Amino acid sequence: MGIETVYQDLALADDLSVGANIFLGREPVRRLFGVLPIIDNGRIRRETQALLARIESRIPPSARTVSRLSGGQRQAVSIARALYWQAKVVIMDEPTAALAAMEREHVIQLARRLASEGAGVIYIGHNLIEILEVADRVAVMYRGRIVHVTQASDSHQEELIKYMTGFNSAAA
């Protein structure tokens, strides 16, 4: 329960299942004969199915490995992982890069879901329309420094572009 990251490059283990990716490095174990610890694959399956239903995932049950999933489905796996582990902060680094419009909308809905369930979401991106749609507050960086912070509801694309490109005197 801490910080989770949803990467732009869909950083998942391609040859593993959806459940194995969600639990990667934190696999539940059970004791065989009361002694030998083994991964509890049944629990992983059950909890993964419940989690995917909870996020209204479009991931087909027949998908054996994440390599068979679309970009949006893969991002849903990363976001589901953050939800399952009850992250307090989720850093989303351009989570909709290279996604189709429908997939992008589903990822945006999941980002909102994270926030509604109490996670602080840091949403990094270049698509200002998307940023203004998702964010409560917007911070603009120029040359590695934060040059402007404002409420998203008070912001306009044109104003943010000036800060992003250094054409606003405060960013110079």
Question: What kind of region is each of these model predictions?
Answer:
Residues 1-172:
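Glycine-rich phosphate-binding loops of nucleotide-dependent enzymes
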